[in-house]
């Protein structure tokens, strides 16, 4: 049986090649394998997808490209929500 991560990796590769961006495989310090393209880096998104079981199950149950693209958008919004309070709370004008 194939690992769900292999299927996820294949979907991201397919999505990257369809979008026209040149994709290449990278490995992060903690061993995550992700993709970089001319646009965004998918490593953090993949990590977020693995942390959210509902989002991950959506991808595994409905393996269409549109479901995967929607899940990536949700993961990206979640990442922005995590980072936004930190950016707003930092005042670079303090001396």
UniProtKB/Swiss-Prot annotation:
Organism from which the protein derives: Plasmopara viticola (Downy mildew of grapevine)
* Any one Gene Ontology cellular component term annotated for this protein: host cell nucleus
Which function does this protein serve?
A: Secreted effector that partially suppresses the host cell death induced by cell death-inducing proteins.
The gene is RXLR20
Give the transmembrane region(s). Answer: none
Compartments, as annotated in UniProt = Secreted; Host nucleus; Host cytoplasm
Q: Does the keyword Secreted apply?
A: yes
Principal localisation: secreted
Keyword annotations for this protein? Host cytoplasm, Host nucleus, Secreted, Signal, Virulence
- Give the domain note: Has the canonical translocation RxLR motif, but lacks the canonical EER motif, which characterizes most oomycete effectors identified so far.
Q: What is this protein called?
A: Secreted RxLR effector protein 20
The family line of this record is: Belongs to the RxLR effector family.
Is Signal tagged as a keyword?
yes
Q: Where is this motif: RxLR?
A: 47-50
Q: Where does the signal sequence lie?
A: 1-20
């Amino acid at each position: 049986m194939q690992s769900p991560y292999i299927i996820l990796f294949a979907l991201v590769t397919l999505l990257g090649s369809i979008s026209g961006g040149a994709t290449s495989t990278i490995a992060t310090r903690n061993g995550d394998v992700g993709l970089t393209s001319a646009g965004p880096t998918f490593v953090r998104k993949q990590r977020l997808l693995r942390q959210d079981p509902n989002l991950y199950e959506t991808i595994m149950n409905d393996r269409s490209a549109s479901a995967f693209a929607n899940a990536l958008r949700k993961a990206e919004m979640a990442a922005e929500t995590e980072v936004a309070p930190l950016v707003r709370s930092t005042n670079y004008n303090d001396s």
